[in-house]
C-alpha cells in the first residue's frame, strides 16, 4: 500500500506545469523584429522563409523563425496563436524538432484565402495534412502531447474542448526543441502573436508501468 501511495505521489509531483519563460528561450533564424512582454511574443515574420524537405515540391528549406527551449522525456506543450495572415501559406504554430530531418509543425496556415489547421511531419521528407475551416478564426490553441514514441496534436478555439488533428511518430528517449514557429514562403511577411506558451512535464509512462509492476517487491 505504501509503495502504491508513493507511485501516486511521484506521478502527481512529476506533472508540473508553468509558463515557459520566453526570455530564456533560444532563436533559430532570429527575425529582425519581435517583441516579448510577459508571456507574449509578437513577431514580424520575414518574407520568403519556410520549413520543408524534398517531397512534392522537390526543394528543401530550413530558414524560418523558430523560438524554442529544449526538453527531454514526456510532456504536454500548449500555446495560443493568432496572426495577420495575408498571402498563401502564411502560417504560425507550435514546432517540435530533433534536427533538420526530424521535426513537426502544427498551427494555422492560410491557403487560397481560407484558414486551415495544418500539420507538417518530417522524417527525412515532409508530409502535409490540413483540416479546412469554414470561417476565419481570431485565434487557436495548439497542444502537443509527447508519450513514448508518439506525439498527438490537438486544437481548440476556447482552451477547453480539444480535438485531435494528428498522431505521429517521433523518436523517443531523445531531447527535442519545443517552441514557436512561423513561415511566410510566398509573401513579404506578416505579424504573428503567441500567448501563454507552457510546457508541462509528464511522468515517464514506462517508468510508471515498471513501478506498478514492482509495487509489492
Locate each region found by the language model.
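Bacterial Sec-dependent N-terminal signal peptides
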Residues: 1-21
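Extracellular glycan-recognition regions
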Residues: 20-217
